[in-house]
Amino acid sequence: MISAIIEDIKAIKRNDPAARGLEVILYPTLHAMLFHRFICHPLYKIRLFFLARFFSQLSRFLTGLEIHPGAKIGPGFFCDHGMGVVIGETAVIGRNCVMFHGVTLGGTGKHKRKRHPTVGDNCFIGTHSTLLGPIRVGNGVKIGAESVIVNRDVPDHCTVVGAPAMIVKRGQRKVHPPEPLPFSSYRLDEVKRELGMVIEPDMVSDGGGI
């Protein structure tokens, strides 16, 4: 946990030219990570859910970042400004990710299994972007401000913008016209499972034929 916090401090210095010295210890993103890494997430893992939520709410009040205790966040996380950020329970964020204020990593549906985004390593998520559902955002992805992604995966090393977001760059190569994002592989598997549950009883009652 200490090594993760050290990486978080390095991320502040690396991504914000205004961070010149000891003032990094005043950044809300660092305070939020201290709460999450040392208190909220450990309490959640040992199933002390009320205490975990209590301290996450305290962190939200002090920092403006709403991070569910169940979220998994890799080292080197930096959230500039931070106000209005929402990170859901089953969200996963990789190493060295940067996001700005107003970003939502939200869920779809009311089931208790995976329902929030998984974000890869070295990603950038711009101001007021909304990512919903059990989607996969690949490594090295850049998401432009106010983009909206619902139940769509983002391939590695792509730049996406818009509502709905579309691919405008793959690596260093511009994409014209912009390409739509592929449907969420997790959601497709979920639909297949649900279809299987519907079809299977019929197959049994009909003697196996469709």
Question: Language-model features: where?
Answer:
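Terminal amphipathic alpha-helical/low-complexity segments used for targeting or macromolecular assembly
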Residues: M1-S59, T63, K174-I210
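Structural signal for interior beta-strand "rungs" in well-ordered beta-sheet cores
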Residues: R60-V161, A165-V168
